[in-house]
């Protein structure tokens, strides 16, 4: 494995740690780390439910911090590591902020905007192209998400079962 690949894995592991914070807050476990010159300048994890903010995705949180650190809305020569393929909103923010590269773990067939559903980052109508590297720690990223949604389905099933048992009343 090359030094560059090891570097990508290092930062993706950091993003996975942040994704676990989202899980702990009962948010969809996605984490993001924005790196400039081998230094973290922004990080985030999904928080739209807790913050009552539909834009509080991990990527947006990391980009906002990066802008404050660099004191610039242009995040030139930065790399954003994120555990899940970005959505249209996040991909659009990446284009507007002029990041150099996004590295993501798991693809998102339903809402992925880096090639799965649509490719905002390479769209010919955009005035900036973002380099895409995908599949870094893919299995770990995908497993975290599938485990989270499995747990949520089991919780919902248990609640429905409890509601049915509660509503049944005594046998006559």
Curated annotation (Swiss-Prot):
GO terms for molecular function: tRNA-specific adenosine-34 deaminase activity; zinc ion binding. Gene3D superfamilies: Cytidine Deaminase, domain 2 (3.40.140.10). Disulfide bonds: none annotated. Residues 6-117 form the CMP/dCMP-type deaminase domain. Its EC number is 3.5.4.33. Binds 1 zinc ion per subunit. The keyword Zinc applies. Keywords: Hydrolase, Metal-binding, tRNA processing, Zinc. It catalyses: adenosine(34) in tRNA + H2O + H(+) = inosine(34) in tRNA + NH4(+). The active site is at residue 59. InterPro entries: APOBEC/CMP_deaminase_Zn-bd (IPR016192), CMP_dCMP_dom (IPR002125), Cytidine_deaminase-like (IPR016193), tRNA_aden_deaminase (IPR028883). It comes from the Bacteria. The keyword Zinc applies. Its cofactor is Zn(2+). Zn(2+) binds at residues 57, 87, 90. One of its GO terms (biological process) is tRNA wobble adenosine to inosine editing. Belongs to the cytidine and deoxycytidylate deaminase family. Catalyzes the deamination of adenosine to inosine at the wobble position 34 of tRNA(Arg2). Homodimer. NCBIfam families: PRK10860.1. HAMAP family: tRNA_aden_deaminase (MF_00972). This is tRNA-specific adenosine deaminase.
């Amino acid at each position: 494995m090359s030094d560059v690949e090891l570097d990508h894995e290092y930062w993706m592991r950091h993003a996975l740690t942040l994704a676990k914070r989202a899980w702990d807050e009962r948010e969809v476990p996605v984490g993001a780390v924005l790196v400039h010159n081998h230094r973290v300048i922004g990080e985030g994890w999904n928080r739209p439910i807790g913050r009552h903010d539909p834009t509080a995705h991990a990527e947006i949180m990391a980009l906002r911090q990066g802008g404050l650190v660099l004191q610039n809305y242009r995040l030139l020569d930065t790399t954003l590591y994120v555990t899940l393929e970005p959505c249209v909103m996040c991909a659009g923010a990446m284009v507007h902020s002029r990041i150099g590269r996004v590295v993501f773990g798991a693809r998102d067939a339903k809402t992925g905007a880096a090639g799965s559903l649509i490719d905002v980052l390479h769209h010919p109508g955009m005035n900036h192209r973002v380099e895409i590297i995908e599949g870094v720690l893919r299995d770990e990223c995908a497993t975290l998400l599938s485990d989270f949604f499995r747990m949520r389905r089991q919780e919902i099933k248990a609640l429905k079962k409890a509601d049915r048992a509660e509503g049944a009343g005594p046998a006559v």
